[in-house]
């Protein structure tokens, strides 16, 4: 197993090879609470489950993908109470408050609007909601789930998945703020503020270069949420969305990617919105690969200074096809956020008992200097 330890002022190449910088832990008072020791907070993060209905049998499920996803759920249910290896700090895995899903829950939401595609999408979404549930009481998963949509859920059409998330948000445990569109939402756990921002962060205004994915005014929601839910800039904030952002951190201008996955102008506006807020970390999926980076709003090639930058974590696919799968176990304790990766590598038949192990660990301060 590989353990990634805190570093002191690493250069970029060293950072990308060995993990994120950690700082000394201090107890951070949460918004609306008096200063004091916070109760530990645990949660899981998964991504890219790609529940699949085959094209030749749209009312059924791909048995291989279904098996892997159900193994994933059973693993999530069984991890709490197990012992962490000493290289990961030892102790027991705590019971999570919930599971964050970084998008691409299903597979056929990008396949168009033919009757066949619609049938596949409906079969997949019905299976996802049946297995993953919502509050921890309805499905196979025993914990509440907090999902955002990815490009395989919907590209730009308000389909059954988008409408399903909107309906689920009204019943999702602990949610305190929902966007005007009904799609984006936020909540608080143990003094930490979480914001679910959909596929990308943007506003899709006509006067800006438009990425191909509809943002449903997620940028406006982010601004409003930070202004009204974190007004004193003391509460640690965790953001999550589907698409990775470092590739699209480029100068905003007429030549920005008009047909790319994410408008460079929207990415610029995203960073401008959050750079003076205490964002602890950003999580994304999409790439089906582990990514650990820092983001300071500058193009990737210029990213050499780590101070005042935001840690960004990209998750491996948790389901789907391929040979490598992973999930994050996150623990907030003593003023720090520790992210541990549990992964099943080089196994096409993923998550079989005994094939996964603890692979990586990062510790970052809960409150970043803004």
What spans do the regions from the language model cover?
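Surface-exposed patches in mature extracellular/periplasmic domains of secreted proteins
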Residues: 83-91, 137-143, 235-237
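Acidic, His/Gly-rich catalytic cores of divalent-metal-dependent hydrolytic chemistry
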Residues: 343-370
């Amino acid at each position: 197993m590989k353990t990634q330890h805190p570093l002191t002022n690493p250069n970029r190449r060293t950072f990308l090879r060995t993990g994120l910088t950690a700082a000394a832990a201090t107890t951070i008072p949460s918004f609306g609470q008096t200063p004091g020791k916070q109760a530990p907070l645990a949660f899981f993060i998964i991504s890219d489950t790609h529940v699949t209905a085959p094209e030749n049998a749209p009312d059924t499920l791909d048995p291989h993908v279904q098996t892997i996803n159900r193994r994933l759920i059973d693993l999530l249910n069984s991890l709490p109470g197990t012992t962490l290896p000493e290289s990961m700090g030892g102790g027991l895995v705590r019971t999570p408050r919930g599971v964050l899903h970084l998008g691409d829950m299903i597979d056929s939401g990008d396949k168009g609007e033919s009757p066949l595609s619609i049938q596949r999408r409906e079969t997949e979404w019905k299976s996802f909601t049946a297995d993953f549930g919502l509050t921890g009481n309805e499905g196979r998963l025993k914990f509440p789930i907090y999902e955002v949509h990815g490009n395989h859920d919907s590209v730009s059409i308000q389909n059954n998945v988008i409408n399903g998330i909107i309906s689920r948000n009204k019943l999702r445990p602990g949610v305190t703020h929902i966007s005007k569109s009904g799609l984006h939402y936020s909540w608080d756990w143990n003094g930490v503020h979480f914001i679910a921002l959909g596929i990308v962060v943007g506003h899709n205004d006509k006067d800006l270069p438009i990425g191909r994915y509809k943002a449903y005014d997620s940028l406006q929601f982010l601004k409003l949420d930070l202004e009204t839910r974190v007004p004193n800039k003391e509460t640690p904030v965790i953001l999550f969305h589907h698409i990775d952002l470092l590739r699209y951190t480029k100068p905003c201008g007429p030549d920005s990617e008009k047909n790319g996955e994410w408008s460079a102008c929207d990415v610029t506006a995203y960073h401008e919105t959050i750079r003076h807020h205490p964002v602890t970390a950003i999580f994304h999926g999409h790439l089906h690969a582990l990514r650990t980076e820092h983001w300071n709003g500058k193009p990737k090639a210029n990213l050499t200074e780590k101070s005042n930058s935001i840690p960004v974590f990209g998750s491996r696919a948790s389901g789907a096809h391929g040979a490598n799968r992973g999930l994050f176990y996150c623990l907030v304790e003593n003023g720090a956020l520790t992210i541990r990766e549990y992964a099943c590598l080089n196994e096409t038949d993923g998550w079989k008992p005994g094939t996964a192990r603890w692979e990586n660990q990062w510790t970052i301060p809960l409150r970043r200097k803004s």
